[in-house]
Amino acid sequence: SVQDAIDTAVASAMVADSPVKASYGSKGFRLETRDGNWQTNLQWRAQFRYSNPYGSDPRQIANYEDASGSSFEQRRLRMKIGGHGFQPWIKYYFELDLQPARDVDADAVSSSARVIDWRVDLTKWDWASVRLGQWKVDLNRERGDSSGRQQFVERSIVNRIFTVDRQVGVQLRGRLFDGTLADMRYYAGVFNGEGRGTKNSSTDHLYMGRLQWNFLGRDLAWRQTDVEYTELPTGSLAVAGFTNTGPCTRWSSSGCGNLDGFAKPIVAEDDQFKIEQAVQEFAFKYRGLSIQQEWHRKFVSDRVAGTDSDLTGFYVQTGYFFHNLIEAFPAPLELAARYAYVSEPNKAMRSIYNEREEFSLGANWFFSGHSNKVTVDFSHLTLDDGLLETTHSENRFRVQWDVSF
């Protein structure tokens, strides 16, 4: 009708005259000024998981002897806010973890809301940009890949021991020789080394570096699986490392922590542990095929006990959308496999080493890419206790719905 046409024209004119436009995309709801200088994206995310028998990877004999757990878990209830201000190259991002899951005997504070990421990026030049704030240090892909962009329900057994996780600091980063066979990315940073939201307890800092070669001249995004169906073969080969002196022997989203058998940070001296760690990494994607691999070495010097320990970790995983070969195979379904290995000091006697292995098979059904998917995986987990000279094993089943709005 004439009235409807008038109403539509008036509404269109009002939208065109508005200084702010609204939309929805891969980063959630977006508000943006028409000059492009200001932008805010808001996204909500949640994971709902069922695990049997373990909620986390078993590491000690006692875990294998008590394999009776069966649990539903709300994971990573997150709010993400990011965008840019003043200029498109002045970017910001922060992320809130609204309700971390906790054990029944844990303090309620452990499940309270917390800011896990906050950072500002100055990206005027591709060859040199600066990031400052708190984020997951860009050391390796498995940890750097978002938990919402994983190929399995959770990261491998390697992650807990070798991640440097979130730190507070500053980093210089950039991309050189874009589009050539020498295409590469570099990262060099200085951090407190005490984990998330923590001041430095000494004059020492955590120093890290990463060099990534995009050997086919194309950059590979930090996300797992090839649900995007990469048309041209794309891969990267990287080496990275860090050194730190302080009370921490491991890190997580909760901050500074300790490896099994090592002093907890609350009782350790400020400069008790010197850590040197290196990683080699490979990643590749092509037409539904994805491959990712890492090899880690970690050296821990205990200045109080006068001991040196070294840890080794390795994993390789691959996935494929078989619809690309067999038309009758469902297009949204990806099948995946992973092997992981860890060698670490025995908790009771650090001069003797335990070995753990993970054999996992997984399947992903993508309703809307990584933004809405169901993941199922089955793992066979083993422990060779070097002190008692015994071998233990158990199977684990997990299923998870991961959704972002």
Predicted regions and their residues:
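Surface-exposed loop and membrane-interface regions of Gram-negative outer-membrane beta-barrel proteins
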Residues: 8-22, 50-129, 140-145, 150, ...
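Short loop/turn motifs that connect adjacent beta-strands in outer-membrane beta-barrel proteins
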Residues: 31-40, 55, 86-90, 127, ...
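Residues that define the transmembrane beta-barrel architecture of outer-membrane proteins
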Residues: 25, 38, 68-77, 111-116, ...
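N-terminal periplasmic/intermembrane-space "pro-region" immediately following the signal or transit peptide
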Residues: 1-47, 54-61, 179-183, 221-222, ...
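Residues on the lipid-exposed face of transmembrane beta-strands in outer-membrane beta-barrel proteins
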Residues: 29-33, 44-46, 74, 79-83, ...
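Transmembrane beta-strands of outer-membrane beta-barrel proteins
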Residues: 43-49, 93-97, 133-135, 187-191, ...
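Outer-membrane beta-barrel pore domains
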Residues: 15, 20-21, 55, 65, ...
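Surface-exposed coil loops of outer-membrane beta-barrel proteins
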Residues: 58-67, 101-114, 125-212, 218-230, ...
